[in-house]
């Protein structure tokens, strides 16, 4: 069910929002572990459902364009069982949350968004901007607001500024993510004449749209989130992330992109949202509530890929720094003395 494509990329930032909401509300994140597990399982079910119906409805187009489809070789009974299993378990989660209307509504909204995006006769994927909004909402907006609502429900308090800033950020980030995805799929979509938003507009226009409208909105709302959450460590790790990417650019020529893919690129802020932001909040909360430190190991166990890659890169940077320092010392030692 393509879990490798969505597990860490979509669920880790959503958990980070839950951590941030708890930190803002001044409650131990560890006290929420049962709710966090239920939310994680619920969103994983929804993402698995989205993957299955997307591959199912794209099957013929993928075959025609030569794109990989994960349902190739799967029996009809397997596909039906996977869909029914996801739906039944999703309904069970909705029943479990039945006491909170907003929580259930946000959860069901993600399912509806994915259904409208993929399934005919709606198939918003081929209807331009409607497809962008449906996918961005299902993947990022509704899950992020679900995380805020779940923690707020547990605390018994609702922060309107926080809710609004998270909504703006998650929708903007979701739009940027689906635009990047559609641009990456552009060669395949052109072969089958698939009418996605990216196919209906010139790449130069999409570049400007992403760089000068979507990303500034995302960045502004995220700055508001950082201010509201009140974690200095989250800001410090943002600066560290910027240095990290600058070193990658310097050593390996890695390009940072907003929406339009390039050779050897990283998507701007993706690593921060997936790795550094949740870790910053867990570490910040641990200074108030030492038991929250246990969740750091749990989070890294669930989402190890980004952390392992960052650790490998950091080792290279440290080695490069040692080489530079050694060379600088060697030059000083060999420099002629002043008379």
Spans of model-derived segments:
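Multi-pass alpha-helical membrane architecture of UbiA-family
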Residues: 1-339
